[in-house]
Amino acid sequence: MIKLYGIGLSFNVSKVRYCLNYLNLKYDWAQTNPIAGENQSAEFLNICPTGKIPAIEIDGLKLFESNSINRYLATINHSPIYPQDAKKRAIVDAWMDYVAIHVAHALGRVLFNRMFAPMTGQKVDQESIRVGLEFLDKYFPILEKQLSQNPYLAGKEFSLADINLLAILDPCELAQISIDRYPSLKKWRSGLQSQPFYQKCYKDYSQFVLDAVNAKAGK
């Protein structure tokens, strides 16, 4: 039995959902909304001591952190999206970490201040937006170069690194971040968004988020 805790708006949760879908694994969905404080309940903290989403229960194992969850899922299912070969696996790990540590952090700065801060009545930090965009102007060309030379982020084969980046880029339109200057990155993204593992979650991520926000506001 697999039980996933999270919220549909989170790109880190999306990472795990894409992985589960790609591996054709059935799971129970436990809506856990941090904005409502549901991640601080005693029940959830017993699953995830850090109080962060996503978290997962699988055959008695309680696990958190999206990258760790996906690595575990791919490993126990002997999937090539997380290679057995140590060298190939290291390359996948390197790109997974690059996306999670650098790209996600920079994009998150912009997304929070352009969308979630105004939505929740918090102060918008224009300097944080500037810094985030400045970093993305450094990071996107690196991704563009890699994807202009390879069909996938870690090389010739689709991997967890692609799932990571695909999920991280989901909020680009909401954050008013364009990747039009990066044709290889844009083509790669469009190709994966048409795949069943993605479509099972979202036909259109931006519209999904806007619908959720409008529903909450009673519009």
Where are these regions (language model features)?
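GST-like domain detector, emphasizing the conserved glutathione-binding G-site
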Residues: 1-130, 219
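GST-like fold's C-terminal all-alpha helical module
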Residues: 99-194
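Acidic/histidine-enriched, glycine/proline-rich intrinsically disordered or flexible terminal extensions
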Residues: 205-219
